[in-house]
């Protein structure tokens, strides 16, 4: 029970930090469109999540929960991504919306793969 409580607290703390950072970054990037800011933040979270996955066996479970589930989960947001795609589609049409969706998913996957590769590369050098 203590292990689960510690994991829950780690997720809570990481989520709080990630969510606040996301909000701060949103305010710091006022010149960017809403879709561009969300895109950048989500891609950064995908990269970090891939890196954490690669080094997960070296991390205490609470630290992994804090970083992966909490921080990355709080930093990135699927709901904002979908809402912004909906708004983009309504303003600019389905082809633009589908293109943006495809690009963000592909970039997120590429970022996660790159983060994991860099994490594994670091592990190999140890």
Curated annotation (Swiss-Prot):
Record text on activity regulation: Na(+) is not transported, but it plays an essential structural role and its presence is essential for fluoride channel function.
Subcellular location: Cell inner membrane
One Gene Ontology molecular-function label: metal ion binding
Family membership: Belongs to the fluoride channel Fluc/FEX (TC 1.A.43) family.
GO cellular component: plasma membrane
Pfam families: CRCB (PF02537)
Keyword line: Cell inner membrane, Cell membrane, Ion channel, Ion transport, Membrane, Metal-binding, Plasmid, Sodium, Transmembrane, Transmembrane helix, Transport
Encoding gene per record: fluC
Catalytic activity: fluoride(in) = fluoride(out)
Organism: Ruegeria pomeroyi (strain ATCC 700808 / DSM 15171 / DSS-3) (Silicibacter pomeroyi)
One of the protein's GO biological processes: cellular detoxification of fluoride
Record flagged with keyword DNA-binding: no
Keyword Cell membrane set for record: yes
Protein name, per record: Fluoride-specific ion channel FluC
Role: Fluoride-specific ion channel. Important for reducing fluoride concentration in the cell, thus reducing its toxicity.
Transmembrane regions: 9-29, 35-55, 63-83, 94-114
Membrane topology: Multi-pass membrane protein
Residues that bind Na(+): 73, 76
């Amino acid at each position: 029970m203590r292990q689960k409580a510690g994991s829950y607290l780690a997720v809570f703390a990481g989520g709080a930090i990630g969510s606040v950072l996301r909000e701060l970054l949103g305010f710091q990037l006022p010149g960017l469109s809403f879709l561009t800011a969300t895109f950048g933040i989500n891609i950064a979270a995908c990269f970090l999540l891939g890196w954490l996955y690669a080094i997960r066996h070296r991390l205490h479970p609470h630290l992994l929960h804090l970083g992966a589930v909490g921080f990355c989960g709080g930093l990135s947001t699927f709901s904002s991504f979908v809402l912004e795609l909906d708004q983009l589609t309504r303003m600019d049409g389905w082809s633009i919306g589908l293109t943006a969706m495809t690009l963000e998913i592909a970039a997120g996957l590429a970022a996660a793969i790159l983060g994991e590769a860099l994490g594994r590369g670091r592990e190999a050098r140890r």
